Amino acid sequence: MKGLAFCTAILFLVGSLPGQEAPSPADVARYGQYPADYKEIIMKWLDTQLVDAPSARIEWTSEPKATDYEKNGEHFYGYLVTFTVNARNRFGTYTGKQRHGAVIKNGEVIKGLGLGY
C-alpha cells in the first residue's frame, strides 16, 4: 500500500514539472519561430559586424529565450541569445572576451547587444 502511494506521489510530481511547451500561435506571431539554428544565424550576422570574423572565438552562454527587449522606447520582440566574442581587431590583436547578445526573429538578427550598439 505504501509503495502504491509512493508511486502515485512520484507520478504526480513528475507530471507537474514545467516542460518545454509548444509556443502558442500568439507567441509565434510576436516572437517568431524558435531559432533552432541560432548559432548559424548569429555567425552569419557576425561576419558582417566584425573586422576579422574568421578569427572570432565564440562561447555560447545561453540558449534562445523569448524576450521583449526595449531600448529608447522601441521594443524588439524575438529570442535573445547571449555569448562572448574574442576576435582580432584592426591591429591584428585579440580583444579579449567581450559579452554580447543578439535578438533573433524569423531567422535573422533584428538587434545586436554590445558591438557598439
Question: What is the meaning of each model-derived region?
Answer:
Residues 4-14:
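Sec-dependent N-terminal signal peptides
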Residues 20-117:
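Cystatin/cathelin-like cysteine-protease inhibitor module
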